[in-house]
């Protein structure tokens, strides 16, 4: 459902569904939604877990939007955040069968950065934007995403992504840009 919303918003046009070997494509609850998206021109791919791990390491630029089952999603998220080098630059979405949603920041575990103004707050802020989107607040969500894109374009990123900012500086930059857009409801 979350992937379908992202695709329908026009942000993505390619979806990869990763399933363990014991959950064959024919048993997936995603078959019907995937077929509906394919009918609308969205490129749908299916992958086994081992093939997905290979693609993460060999062809990461070919991956766009990925959905899978627990616990694989958590494993993939941690692995990808470690590969990208970000200390909190991304987030993951978990949705239960009864439609409860949880957004969680992706980052490798690293106690050596505690108290050093080194974590990247972008994933946390993007997860807030996703939460607001899920609560039918698309204008606020879009404003947050736009400010983050502006920050990245202006090279206002944390040291883990090659910038010179700390956690507090990038957070303050994003908040100051958002406060200038306070008329958005």
Annotate each predicted stretch with a short phrase.
Residues 3, 34, 124-132, 174:
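Buried hydrophobic packing segments
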Residues 1-48:
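Glycine-rich phosphate/diphosphate-binding loop of Rossmann-like nucleotide-binding domains
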Residues 43-62:
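A structured beta-alpha segment of the ubiquitous adenosine-cofactor-binding alpha/beta core
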Residues 57-154:
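Glycine-rich phosphate/nucleotide-binding loop
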Residues 23-24, 42, 46, 65, ...:
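Hydrophobic alpha-helical scaffolding
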Residues 23, 50-53, 72-74:
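Short, catalytically relevant binding-site loops at active-site mouths
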Residues 1-15, 23, 138, 143, ...:
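Glycine-rich phosphate/pyrophosphate-binding loop and the adjoining helix
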Residues 28, 46-50, 122, 138, ...:
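Conserved structured core elements
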């Amino acid at each position: 459902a979350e992937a379908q919303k992202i695709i329908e918003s026009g942000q993505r046009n390619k979806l990869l569904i990763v399933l363990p070997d014991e959950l064959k494509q024919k048993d997936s609850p995603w078959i019907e939604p995937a077929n509906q998206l394919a009918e609308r021109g969205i490129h749908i791919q299916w992958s086994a877990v081992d093939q997905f791990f290979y693609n993460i390491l060999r062809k990461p630029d070919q991956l766009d939007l990925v959905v899978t089952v627990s616990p694989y999603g958590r494993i993939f998220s941690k692995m990808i955040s470690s590969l990208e080098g970000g200390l909190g630059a991304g987030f993951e979405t978990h949705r239960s069968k009864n439609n409860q949603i949880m957004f969680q920041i992706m980052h490798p575990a690293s106690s050596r950065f505690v108290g050093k103004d080194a974590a990247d707050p972008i994933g946390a802020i993007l997860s807030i934007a996703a939460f607001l989107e899920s609560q039918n607040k698309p204008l606020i969500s879009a404003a947050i995403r736009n400010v983050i894109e502006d920050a990245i374009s202006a090279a206002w990123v944390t040291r883990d992504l090659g910038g010179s900012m700390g956690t507090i500086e990038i957070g303050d930059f994003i908040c100051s840009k958002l406060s200038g857009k306070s008329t958005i409801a």
